[in-house]
Curated annotation (Swiss-Prot):
NADPH binds at S33, F34, R54, K128, A160, R275, V299, E301. Keywords: Cytoplasm, Lipid biosynthesis, Lipid metabolism, NAD, NADP, Nucleotide-binding, Oxidoreductase, Phospholipid biosynthesis, Phospholipid metabolism. Its EC number is 1.1.1.94. It comes from Saccharophagus degradans (strain 2-40 / ATCC 43961 / DSM 17024). Catalyzes the reduction of the glycolytic intermediate dihydroxyacetone phosphate (DHAP) to sn-glycerol 3-phosphate (G3P), the key precursor for phospholipid synthesis. One of its GO terms (cellular component) is cytosol. One of its GO terms (molecular function) is NAD binding. The keyword Nucleotidyltransferase does not apply. It catalyses: sn-glycerol 3-phosphate + NAD(+) = dihydroxyacetone phosphate + NADH + H(+); sn-glycerol 3-phosphate + NADP(+) = dihydroxyacetone phosphate + NADPH + H(+). This is Glycerol-3-phosphate dehydrogenase [NAD(P)+].
Amino acid sequence: MLQLLVEFFSLTENQAYNNMSSKYTVTVLGGGSFGTAVANIIATNGHVSRLWMRDAARAERCQASRENTEYLPGYPLHDNLVATTDLIGSVSTSDIVVISVPSQSFREVAKLAAPHLRKDTIVISTTKGIDADGFFLMSQILEQELTDVRIGVLSGPNFAKEIVQNQYTGSVVASEHDEVLKCVQQVFSSNTFRIYSNPDRYGVELGGALKNIYAMVTGMAAALGCGHNTMAMLLTRSLAEMGRFARELGADSMTFLGLAGMGDLVLTCTSDLSRNYRVGFAVGRGKSLEQAVQEIGQVAEGVNTLRIVKKKAEELNVYMPLVDGLHAVLFDKQDLQQVIQGLMTGEMSSDVDLQGGL
């Protein structure tokens, strides 16, 4: 089986990308776990890789120890990776800029980078979230703040820790620019990290943001001791809600059958490596939302996304019972068991909307 995986990840598509002679300069803005993992892949692939951090002391420790002790302790970084606090010098000389910061900081960082980007720079977002002020996805913020650049997103079932462990991983790059798709596949792909392409940037990005909500739902279910039947029901109903919501916003609901939809949903909803899953698990065990967020010590994007999506779903009149139920528990302080009973005894509905796609 392992040999089959090795052969799969070494198929001609990835071989072609990795054998190309072009050497790129890439800056990753954001020294968290995923930004570090991405920067490390790029460095390992032989490109110039810079990892920008705000905190000078952190950057110095990372550069000296060859390890991101705060977010990926115990995993050595490639010698080609340079940790820096020089944003201007880094982005002004980069072919590709990757923004990998929490959604609350995304616009600020985009504004910092904007005056220093070269024309036609490829700018990639890896942030999975939604800006509450206008319901903007991260790539839409890039369109608002940047000019004369080519924009894309990278999303999928990707835990940073497993990426740096060289676990076999698939991800999706999405952009309306074919050259962005090809370039990211070339620069980011490796023998253990396989990049697929999709022109539906909006759908890919929505999938990455929405699944965080449902990870909290399944985390709660796990804390309550629910069985496999329950988890299967929750996953499939979550996918249906995601597809319904995305279709109303103009995305291709079929995107949600791929890595950025179903793939990311399954990963995030079934693993305690997920921060959002752990928040849900803690709440299911009786802790308040505030206690749960404090306990994990890192940003759980699903908490903010839930508020935003609940409001938007009401505006669009989209049926999202899991979103409604989770919001009732976390923010309206309704009893969890009563909410569950309400979901199970609510109005009957169809399983799959064949005309709509999901």
